[in-house]
Amino acid sequence: MTDYRIEAPPILRDFLTYHETIQGHSKKTVDEYFLDLRTFFRYIKIEKGRVPRSTALDEITISDVDLELIRSVTLTDIYAFLSFLSRDRAKHANDPSTRYGLEVSSRARKAAAIRSFYKYLVNKAKILDENPIQELDSPKIRQALPRYLTLDESIQLLESVDGDNAERDYCIITLFLNCGLRISELVGLNISDIREDRLRVLGKGNKERIVYLNAACQNAIEDWLEVRRQSGPADPNALFITRRHKRITKDGVHYMLKQRFTAAGLDSSKYSAHKLRHTAATLMLQNGVDVRTLQEVLGHEHLNTTQIYTHVDSDSLRDAARSNPLGSVKVKRRGRPKKQAES
């Protein structure tokens, strides 16, 4: 696995170490911070004349980024960088046929990384006296309603699971639909994570949470473990394994789900493991689970991330309109004075 910190200047390396050791962020999250800041400082080196403007962005080193360059950054520089990302940055750097302009979510993530870095320099490292980008506004992300399966479609999917690996696949789908797990959380599950009706889940940023298992989940796990025990020597820890007795991978789960969606008569291009997580969240909300409890179940750090699931379908909106007590009241209206005809 690549250790990007080798490329980082000391001041940036300290920031990355802080996030991993003090904030407890995962290596993946810290690596993303580095990659976003590397792109930013490559751009800044061009704009500040540290390298010739003709230099390819991806060939610029940031190992020489110093405090002088960091201090020289202004709010205007940040907005110019975000504009560059939206218009001129290749979506896929190594693909000659790629289109240009990053999605708003990618631009917002880079803005968040820059904001976090400068906040660290002021509040934690005490290297800067004031934050030059304190007033930075992030690109607005349009929150699209998540796609999800209806209750009937969920049952249809579960009922269609048969054939090879049926117990394993049924158990995986059941956990997605009932517990709202992320795919990375599911493939990382170990047998030792199961404690009666509780499941220990390692989520984003290496944060642990406990998910309680209902009867459907407990039965599915029991059936799968019985089959797993009979399959011969296997990874002693992994809950879900392949035919080769290795821990199942995210790609393996994606492939399996694609096959299972198709077999159930569902459009496999529209649904995925994450859509099953959306489904679990939606069904729980529709059946009385409050948003804060759902936040804990899903492992969301911020409540506003969970609130995207508070969408309601058109039938619910229609029922809400009908339930308004004024909806059936016939109001006797006073007659309006007739408008005099113009002469």
Residue ranges and their predicted role:
Residues 1-343:
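Conserved catalytic core of the tyrosine transesterase superfamily
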